[in-house]
């Protein structure tokens, strides 16, 4: 071990070099024990592997290739940002910017003012606030508008969105009290009417985008709920979750309400995510009536939850693409991947398979498969796709998956039928050479 460490590049800290050497030796021993190692190794190869691992692990957060077919993959960073968003990030993040400076009068401005005009055009909302995620958005809204009051929520909408983030707990954390309305499968307008008291502070709608209650169900129309809320001087708050700006039905997807639609139907405040169906950075976007947004701006929580210049820049650039629907569909990677046809996926699969076919000891096939949208969106809907299917007598499916994951650029696959599936919906053409190089290294 000491002899090896002395020959490693001195630019790396001793601790990191030692850890990398131990990992390489452990991997080599494992290959020998499992019988997957067919050639002997010497000191030169060990040093090469250690050097490679040190270079790869310079940073913990790394780029990966998503071969799972899940477009909005939470574990892999959710939505990819567009090329135009990247340009805007470079322009504003590596230089000074007018983040909180009004260029017209030279005085201090608001970071949120950069989004007001574009949000008005896209949704019709009077004002906008942005915090670091939708959970924070819901917390800020309730803390600002319903503290020490009751919040009416249908029992069928008392959801958990993941990570133990539950609507009842959020209401309690924000200082309010939950008032459950109706039943799990049926809630009528009269249920809300009967639940109204002098303590009621708001009516909350939670869009169940990550699950479905089907069959014998009923829920009042938003327009009726808005009329009831406004007749009692209450705000109607809508947690829309994923947050669509475009109607996705032309792509064969089921109907989901857009932000503009729910605002037009009378909702006073709407919250949604930036990094799901919108295809932007992680953010919690709050849009709605100015009188309610102004109350949120005075909440001390806002300072703790506010977004930075990079998130703001990326979000503005993403929203700008939606001013032209055609451009959004072509330029926002999330929408582009969702919109890929079955034929497009087959064409990509054929191209990748042709590149991999010459590799010895690797079986390469093309199979019809299904992709998921992910991110808690369209839970029941699968997208038809094609996958390149890899198998080998030399490695089990689990071992091959591990080796792909340990590549210089980690490749994340899905195991099915004892094979590794690479779904072409979530793999770009530019990533094909990297996949080939990784497999050449594995099967050399």
Where are these regions (language model features)?
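N-terminal Rossmann-like NAD(P)+-binding subdomain of aldehyde/semialdehyde dehydrogenases
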Residues: 57, 63-80
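Short Gly/Ser/Thr- and Asp/Glu-enriched loop/turn motifs at secondary-structure junctions
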Residues: 1, 65-69, 278-281, 383, ...
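Long amphipathic alpha-helical segments
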Residues: 1-57
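Structural motif of enzymes handling amino- and sulfur-group chemistry
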Residues: 291, 299-300, 307-356, 369-370, ...
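A short linear hydrophobic-aromatic micro-motif
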Residues: 60-61, 272, 409-414
């Amino acid at each position: 071990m000491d002899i090896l460490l002395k020959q490693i590049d001195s630019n790396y800290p001793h601790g990191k070099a030692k850890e990398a050497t131990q990992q390489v030796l452990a991997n080599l021993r494992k290959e020998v024990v499992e019988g997957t190692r067919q050639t002997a190794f010497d000191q030169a190869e060990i040093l090469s592997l250690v050097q490679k691992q040190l270079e790869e692990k310079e940073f913990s957060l790394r780029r990966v290739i998503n071969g799972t077919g899940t477009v909005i993959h939470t574990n892999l960073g959710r939505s990819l940002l567009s090329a135009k968003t990247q340009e805007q990030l470079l322009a504003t993040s590596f230089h000074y910017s007018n983040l909180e400076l009004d260029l017209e009068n030279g005085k201090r401005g608001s970071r949120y003012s950069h989004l007001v005009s574009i949000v008005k055009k896209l949704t019709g909302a009077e004002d906008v606030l942005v915090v670091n995620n939708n959970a924070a958005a819901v917390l800020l809204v309730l803390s600002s508008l319903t503290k020490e009051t009751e919040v009416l929520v249908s029992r069928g909408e008392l959801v958990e969105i993941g990570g133990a983030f539950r609507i009842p707990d959020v209401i309690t954390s924000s200082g309010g009290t939950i008032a459950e309305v109706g039943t799990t499968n049926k809630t009528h307008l009269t249920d809300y009417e009967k639940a109204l008291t002098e303590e009621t502070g708001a009516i909350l709608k939670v869009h169940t985008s990550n699950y479905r209650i089907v069959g014998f169900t009923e829920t009042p129309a938003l327009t009726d709920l808005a009329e009831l809320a406004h007749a009692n001087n209450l705000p109607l708050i809508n947690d829309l979750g994923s947050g669509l700006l475009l109607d996705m039905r032309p792509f064969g997807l089921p109907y989901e309400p857009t932000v503009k639609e729910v605002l037009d139907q009378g909702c006073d405040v709407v919250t949604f995510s930036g990094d799901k169906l919108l295809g932007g950075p992680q953010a919690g976007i709050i849009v709605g009536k100015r009188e309610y947004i102004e109350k949120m701006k005075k909440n001390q929580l806002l300072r703790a939850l506010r977004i930075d210049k990079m998130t703001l820049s990326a979000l503005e650039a993403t929203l700008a693409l939606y001013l032209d629907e055609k451009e959004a569909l072509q330029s926002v990677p999330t929408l582009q991947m969702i919109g890929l046809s079955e034929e497009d996926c087959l064409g990509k699969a054929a191209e990748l398979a042709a590149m991999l076919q010459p590799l010895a000891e690797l079986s390469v096939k093309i199979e019809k498969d299904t992709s998921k949208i992910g991110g808690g969106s369209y839970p029941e809907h699968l997208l038809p796709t094609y996958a390149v299917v890899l198998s080998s007598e030399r490695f089990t499916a689990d071992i091959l998956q591990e080796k792909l994951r340990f590549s210089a650029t980690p490749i994340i696959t899905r195991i099915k039928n004892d094979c590794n599936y690479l779904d072409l919906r979530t793999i770009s053409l530019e990533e094909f050479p990297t996949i080939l190089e990784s497999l050449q290294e594995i099967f050399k």
